[in-house]
């Protein structure tokens, strides 16, 4: 198995999801298990600009289009996508200046910083066999 490492901004991940090019829950993935508090603290980490753990994906080409299957990182990506889609308000345990806000209520410069935040991704590109 070979891996390729690269970084993508959250805006790319949002676009992959919006265009149905991101599979968050393949058969081997568990369903959403993180608490709201854990999801909110991940968003707090991103707002502060602190790196988060890598995400692992497998890219699949279908009819010339790249689809991404999440191998590890589903809980993190789900929380991020919920936040940028205004489905996760910054409630407790978050206690910063954006308390109780959803993404679209944040100042535009903060929204842009979040969308530009880079997530390290390892992509499987070849399997032995």
Regions found by a protein language model. Name each.
Residues 1-12, 22-129:
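Basic- and aromatic-enriched surface patches that contact anionic nucleotides/nucleic acids
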